[in-house]
Amino acid sequence: MSNSDKNNNNNTNNNNNNNNNNNGNFGIWEEPDDDSTNENEELFNNLITKTTKFIDDDEEEEEEESSWDTLYAKHVETSNTTQPFNNSNSNNNNFQTQPTNISTLNPNNNNSNNSSSGSSSSRGVRTPRGTRSNSPPQPSKNETVQKESSGDISEGFTLIDSPNDNNDNKNNNKNNNNDSNIVDDDEDEEEFPTLSKKNQKRKPKKSTSSPSSTSSPIVSPQTQTSKLESSMDVSPSSGKQSWSELLKNVADEDINNNNNNNNNNNSNQYHQEEENYYDSDDYDSSPFAIINNSSTTTNNNNNNNNNTTTTTTTTTTTNSSSLPIVNSQSFEEGEEITSDIKIGIKPKTVTVPFQSTLSLRARTKQIKKVQQQQQQSSKSKPNNNNNKFVDNNPYAVLEEEERALQSAIKASLLLNSPVDLDSKQQNVSQQKQQQEQQPTTTTNSVSSSKSKSVATTDKNRTTSTAVAPTTSSNKKANKSNKTSTANTTATTTTTASSKKNKSNSNKSSNVSNTTTTTSTTENSASEGSFIKNAVIFIFILLLMVVGFKYTQTLNQ
């Protein structure tokens, strides 16, 4: 501060001597004095307003005096004449001086003997070295804070020479005009409108996702781009970055991420959106845009590039043929669907409409059913070329053998059914005639399946295996039924997978069929005789019991 300022603040010459001594001992740092509270408050006002400046206002703009945005913008004016300083100093002052300004900048704190307030307010304050700039005399108490807060910061810093020392008087005149307006308009609210309005302006800062400016009030949104561009050029030599500059970088990053091709169009669109949704006259409303800018810019990209993209909300798909479906079908371009795209299901075409909610077992069952249907459809189509048929369905030969075996088993079961012997013999004769007339049909496959066992064993041996259960059937009726059916199935199923020795197949099959049929007829005849014998035996036992009881009664 200058000597005239100290005299107006009722400081003594002892204070000057102390400052000189402290400068010699401690460099540019000043030790606190009990009588220097007013000076320290003024220095703090100067530092706070210069380090916590959030707006870079254009001088050519004319705003309404009714809004507190315009008052704050006028108060923080004179940014072109400020002294640039280092980035580390600015950051330190932002965090050191800002918490203490509310306690120290109290107009009722006039006690110069209060050592605690002086010591707490004067820590870290820089005193000038060398020449000192002249300043006008101090006005009243209410105007001192405002005037000194908007003064030249070169009074507190002398490390770097100010390039704009010639414009000090002009800036001081502007500050006087601006201060008078602020005091007249804000007398009804609080004595320090800058602090209260700054705190109010910081309240709407709710989220960092929106790229709009958080703490700089936008009075005329039409000139927002010019404000943001002008904020880049205010203090080029200083390492400090203003809030508007940082917020512009955030907005540019969001726009670049969302728009790879049209950066300029989307930046203009972002400002137009904010113009539509922000009202400068509404003091309580936040300057954030209501619409999420990321979603709107993606949709506009789609309109500009004429590309349809698949998102969670859209219903059109492009090039999703790689997604697997049960029937190996794919989507067509521009086709509307109602199910989840990732699963790749069209409920109208798939048999199970709720396949996305089915379990793994249900899905595997459905896949097996579809495969079986495809195999049956391929079977129903006659193919003259056996090679192609085998290539399409490698299990076709085995399936034919299984069908032939099933037909043979059914025939054997019919023979074992309780029918008269004449009808059985007629069935046997019919089967023999069919085998003689159609040796190349199903019986041929049966014979081919039985050729292996017949080639390895003698004919007598096969007949003995077929006739063997007749000896045991005379003892028990139930076992004879089971053994006869088991033997007939055994002679057919044990040789199901053989494909060799086709030359002896017809003869061996005829022999084996005849032996099995004769064995079954003998079994059925023995069953009828056994039942008759059993009935006679039971009748004789009853007669014996009755006679025995009758003799006992006679003896008594």
From Swiss-Prot:
Classification of source organism: Eukaryota, Amoebozoa, Evosea, Eumycetozoa, Dictyostelia
Any one Gene Ontology cellular component term annotated for this protein: membrane
Region (Disordered): 1-40, 80-243, 278-324, 363-391, 422-525
Protein localization: Membrane
Amino acid composition bias (Acidic residues), ranges on this chain: 30-40, 182-192
Keywords, alphabetical: Membrane, Transmembrane, Transmembrane helix
Protein's recorded name: Uncharacterized protein DDB_G0289357
Biased composition (Polar residues): 227-243
